[in-house]
Amino acid sequence: MTTLAIDIGGTKLAAALIGADGQIRDRRELPTPASQTPQALRDALAALVAPLQAHAQQVAIASTGIIRDGSLLALNPHNLGGLLHFPLVKTLEQLSNLPTIAINDAQAAAWAEYQALEGDITDMVFITVSTGVGGGVVSGGKLLTGPSGLAGHIGHTLADPHGPVCGCGRTGCVEAIASGRGIAAAAQGELMGADARTIFTRAGQGDEQAQQLIHRSAHVLARLIADIKATTDCQCVVVGGSVGLAEGYLALVKTYLAQEPAAFHVDLLAAHYRHDAGLLGAALLAQGEKL
């Protein structure tokens, strides 16, 4: 059975056909609409899936935000241009005339990355550092979603009680500091207004402020990972996302994690499926892998 997998992120929308063999075909991308109107997202999704839907038997959506009863509920609306709510499953069933499931994107990615691990691993955590910071938890070989879909939203745990206000309404969240949006928001002087990609480029060129911003992000993430180890006793943490996979970033996180007491150390791995983990995880779940 072929699955039309869709990944809805804060920066881009992606779609692909994924067969039972896990192979990705006909991958396509569009920018995520920076609009508070549901119609803008619906129109973008319609354009994305139209060339693919005739070749699939089902649809699987991996989306940022809390997924509850088939709908997207934005924990941080800024990540989707201010959009608060969107009926994912209903919309895609109308657009494609195919049975549809939806799951949080980091939860989906966690499931795909768990399947790729070697050895006797039953407990792992996936962290994506991108526009926002999200996560997925596998415990005892089972993906945790929680009764309301909130499980794994580790980007909204506390990093600094005196830090910036997060889009979720809390103060000092990990996401508000460590994410691509958080890195960019903290930039000053000649870097003010630059996006995270530009800041990473400038850091590679020796810009001191850019390097400090990236170190700050990596340090916050390392402390989060130590907290996760204390909470879950996971055997490994897999890091993905555009920031998480940026050159040199994971090495920085490892350096800061090594400064924590040994009890909180855990193996850190780069995402095996890189930017396709959400698509693959959603397809796996739609094709019969159990939560």
From Swiss-Prot:
CDD domains: ASKHA_NBD_ROK_EcNanK-like (cd24069). It catalyses: an N-acyl-D-mannosamine + ATP = an N-acyl-D-mannosamine 6-phosphate + ADP + H(+). PROSITE patterns: ROK (PS01125). It comes from the Bacteria. Catalyzes the phosphorylation of N-acetylmannosamine (ManNAc) to ManNAc-6-P. Belongs to the ROK (NagC/XylR) family. NanK subfamily. This is N-acetylmannosamine kinase. It comes from Shigella boydii serotype 18 (strain CDC 3083-94 / BS512). The lineage of its organism: Bacteria, Pseudomonadati, Pseudomonadota, Gammaproteobacteria, Enterobacterales.
